[in-house]
């Protein structure tokens, strides 16, 4: 279904607290549309974003009635966490002949309106999207941006409604949602087997990425991370001759190589694209890759559009050095009595490994206390041995019951305890609390000055920071 955005006034979002859906709602709200929505009563970081944007929403998604609301809507946008006609509000919309589109379908419609840049990958797409939006915005290019988390440099928002024809969006591979998107430029950060409840094997996931590459508009630009072997394999399978492919990375085989990488205080310093001694405020090397991807995309955009930025090098270096971070991405929540409190969204074994090892390397003399909540039964079961291996790296580990997705109907208790017992065999400093709040007093008794405490996962254990 094609959307005529000029004819829309009122838009209603079902599942408005989802990260992407919230960003889209804020984006369209800033563009002047009347936006409302509904979701569950559980609290997420998106509650604050919606409140900051003065967007009204209801918290009774399973009982909510559009008819009782007494307002007419031109479009219903729903989260993929729900079936298209799986809720009363969606059934009512169908009965009332109100157009119903998924979040990813609306994102796809927007991509056809603009010069669009899509960012995809199993890991790092949120951060890369934020970096790209930040660069374009700070350099005066007035972009439109939709990213899956709140960005401090966006004023703690997850969207920018600019006045240019540039549209930058994080796009997701789950259920092949990104195939709705039609980019002029595509950035791929990496590929890892993930979303095992949908992709039956790695080959199915790889095929989805190849399909997405074929969505590039004529003479489109593809940017890949050549440090990722899976992306190099995909590169060899691309048949379209009109696509312009550029690679970046820390290895010699990349078209554009990152060099002179050193850690200095709170910064990773590196050289890239002729810019020497760029200082990026981050504790993780993979953010150097993410920033470099964004910087290369910016450079290619400027070249292909005949644009230039006054004092480009100094401006980019200032942006990198002053980068303030993203919600739930190695976020420093607070420092209290000599303890650093952090929060991170890592929920796949590779993300957990890279984040934990990066933190341990950066904070060499600190004791790392990890509070982890596994996310989805299917992911935990599929990567069970990998989880056991990577989680045992923490100096002290606190585990909780698996946080199920809306699509799952399993009892998580047995698998959660099994994970705990298997890790305990490797790391005796492993503890289990089924419910998050039950661990508060125990964690308080553990923490001493000099520790680093980090909550990790896609569940709700981040609430611990409110009690510590």
Curated annotation (Swiss-Prot):
Q: What class of enzyme is it?
A: ligase
Q: Which GO terms describe its biological process?
A: cell division; cell wall organization; peptidoglycan biosynthetic process; regulation of cell shape
| Ligand binding (ATP) | 121-127
Main location as per UniProt: cytoplasm
Cellular component GO terms held in the UniProt record: cytoplasm
Pathway(s) this gene product operates in, as recorded in its UniProt entry: Cell wall biogenesis; peptidoglycan biosynthesis
The chemistry this enzyme catalyses reads: UDP-N-acetyl-alpha-D-muramate + L-alanine + ATP = UDP-N-acetyl-alpha-D-muramoyl-L-alanine + ADP + phosphate + H(+)
* Enzyme Commission number, as recorded: 6.3.2.8
Q: Which UniProt keywords apply?
A: ATP-binding, Cell cycle, Cell division, Cell shape, Cell wall biogenesis/degradation, Cytoplasm, Ligase, Nucleotide-binding, Peptidoglycan synthesis
PANTHER family reported for this sequence? UDP-N-ACETYLMURAMATE--L-ALANINE LIGASE (PTHR43445:SF3), UDP-N-ACETYLMURAMATE--L-ALANINE LIGASE-RELATED (PTHR43445)
Q: What does this protein do?
A: Cell wall formation.
**Which family is this sequence assigned to?**
Belongs to the MurCDEF family.
State what protein this is by name.
UDP-N-acetylmuramate--L-alanine ligase
Its lineage reads: Bacteria, Pseudomonadati, Spirochaetota, Spirochaetia, Spirochaetales
């Amino acid at each position: 279904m094609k959307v005529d955005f000029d004819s829309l006034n009122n838009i209603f979002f079902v599942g408005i607290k989802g990260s992407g859906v919230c960003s889209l709602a804020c984006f369209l709200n800033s563009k002047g549309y009347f936006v409302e929505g509904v979701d569950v009563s559980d609290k997420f970081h998106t509650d604050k974003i919606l409140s900051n944007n003065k967007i009204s929403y209801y918290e009774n998604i399973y009982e909510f009635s559009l008819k009782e609301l007494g307002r007419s809507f031109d479009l219903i946008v729903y989260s993929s966490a729900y079936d298209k006609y799986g809720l009363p509000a969606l059934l009512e919309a169908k009965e009332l002949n109100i157009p119903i589109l998924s979040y990813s379908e609306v994102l796809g419609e927007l991509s056809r309106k603009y010069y669009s840049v899509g960012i995809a990958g199993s890991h790092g797409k949120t951060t890369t999207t934020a970096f790209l939006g930040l660069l374009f915005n700070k350099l005066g290019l007035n972009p439109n941006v939709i990213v899956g988390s709140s960005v401090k440099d966006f004023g703690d928002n997850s969207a920018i409604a600019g006045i240019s024809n540039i549209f930058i969006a994080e796009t997701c591979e789950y259920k092949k949602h990104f195939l709705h998107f039609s980019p002029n430029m595509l950035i791929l950060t990496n590929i890892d087997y993930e979303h095992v409840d949908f992709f039956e094997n790695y080959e199915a996931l790889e095929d989805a990425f190849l399909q997405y590459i074929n969505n590039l508009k004529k003479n489109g630009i593809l940017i890949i991370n050549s440090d990722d072997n899976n992306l190099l394999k995909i590169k060899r399978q691309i048949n379209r001759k009109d696509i312009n492919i550029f690679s970046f990375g820390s290895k010699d085989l990349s078209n554009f190589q990152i060099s002179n990488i050193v850690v200095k205080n709170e910064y990773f310093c590196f050289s890239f694209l002729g810019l020497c001694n760029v200082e990026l405020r981050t504790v993780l090397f993979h953010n150097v890759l993410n920033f470099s991807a964004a910087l290369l995309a910016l450079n290619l955009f400027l070249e292909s559009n005949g644009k230039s930025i006054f004092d480009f090098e100094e401006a980019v270096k200032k942006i990198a050095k002053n980068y303030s971070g993203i919600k739930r991405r190695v976020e420093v929540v607070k420092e209290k009595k000599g303890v650093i409190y952090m929060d991170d969204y890592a929920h796949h074994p590779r993300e957990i490994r890279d984040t934990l090892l990066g933190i341990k390397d950066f904070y060499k003399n600190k004791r790392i206390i990890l509070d982890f909540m596994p996310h989805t039964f299917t992911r935990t079961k599929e990567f069970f041995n990998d989880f056991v291996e990577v989680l045992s790296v923490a100096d002290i580990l606190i585990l909780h019951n698996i946080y199920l997705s809306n699509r799952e109907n399993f009892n998580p208790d047995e698998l959660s305890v099994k994970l705990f017992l298997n890790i305990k065999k490797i790391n005796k400093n492993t503890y289990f609390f089924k419910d998050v709040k039950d661990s508060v007093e125990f964690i308080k008794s553990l923490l001493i000055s000099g520790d680093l405490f980090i909550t990790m996962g896609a569940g709700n254990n981040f609430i611990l920071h409110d009690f510590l």
